[in-house]
């Protein structure tokens, strides 16, 4: 138990929920909000979603389980969303501005959203043809019909091996499977969004896994059962490059 109970940091609460689910061999635990006066007005979207499944959150407990929620990290940018590519901006969860650390603080995304709006208003004059044209010359046709299946497979890999609890053995296995997916689609033409999206997901998954393997400690949402303690030498951001696939 934690001294702050349900007000403990999100990573702590998620690990506690995960532990209970494992002990009970269950796919969820129960959240009791029936004693919270006006809970439907406080959380209208949750209340409406639960109603669709026949649950009245003012009278019944809610089945819950940890899930991916917010990206802490992303494309390296400055405070104004500039990347190292001319004309390419990254904002919100796509970007790593330095605002987020190893844990997500409530409402920080609102600050990033306000900044993104200001950037958008200031960048309307920028030309749209700064980037290079995508070339399919010499590439073999891609089989786009399996992108949904492979996307689900990638999600399963990341959830299993890089979810709430991580270790070297699991992440090494994840990297093998991610690299296998990457080789499968290497050299394929990709003109449709589902294929472009899948290839980008594979790239990001590989970079996240390599970075997590390199960080031999636990900090915030990055929890390693083989390195459960926080280490001062890792009190910094990790920057990983696709070109080198090594952390800097």
Residue ranges: model-predicted function:
Residues 29, 62-64, 94, 220:
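Long, contiguous hydrophobic alpha-helical segments, chiefly transmembrane helices and signal peptides
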Residues 1-62, 118-124, 132, 144-151:
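An anion/pyrophosphate-binding glycine-rich loop and adjacent beta-alpha core
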Residues 46-89:
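FAD/FMN-dependent oxidoreductases across multiple families
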Residues 2-6, 17-20, 70, 76-90, ...:
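Glycine- and aromatic-enriched mobile tails/lids
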């Amino acid at each position: 138990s934690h001294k702050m109970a349900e007000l403990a940091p999100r990573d702590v609460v998620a690990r506690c929920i995960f532990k209970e689910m494992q002990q009970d061999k269950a796919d969820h635990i129960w959240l009791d909000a029936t004693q919270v006066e006006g809970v439907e007005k406080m959380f209208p979207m949750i209340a409406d979603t639960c109603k669709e499944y026949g649950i009245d959150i003012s009278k019944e407990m809610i089945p819950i389980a940890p899930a991916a929620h917010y990206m802490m990290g992303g494309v390296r940018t400055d405070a104004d969303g500039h990347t190292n590519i001319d004309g390419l901006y990254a904002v919100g969860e796509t970007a790593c501005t330095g605002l987020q650390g190893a844990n997500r603080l409530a409402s920080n995304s609102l600050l990033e959203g306000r900044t993104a709006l200001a950037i958008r208003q200031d960048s309307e004059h920028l030309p749209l043809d700064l980037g290079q044209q995508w070339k399919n010359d010499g590439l073999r046709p891609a089989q786009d019909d399996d992108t949904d299946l492979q996307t689900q497979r990638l999600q399963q890999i990341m959830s299993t091996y890089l979810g709430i609890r991580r270790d070297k053995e699991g992440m090494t296995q994840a990297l093998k499977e991610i690299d296998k997916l990457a080789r499968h689609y290497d050299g394929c033409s990709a003109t449709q969004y589902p294929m472009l999206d899948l290839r980008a997901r594979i790239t990001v998954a590989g970079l996240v896994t390599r970075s997590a393997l390199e960080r031999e400690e636990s900090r915030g949402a990055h929890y390693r059962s083989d390195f459960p303690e926080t280490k001062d030498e890792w009190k910094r951001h990790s920057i990983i490059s696709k070109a080198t696939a090594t952390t800097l």
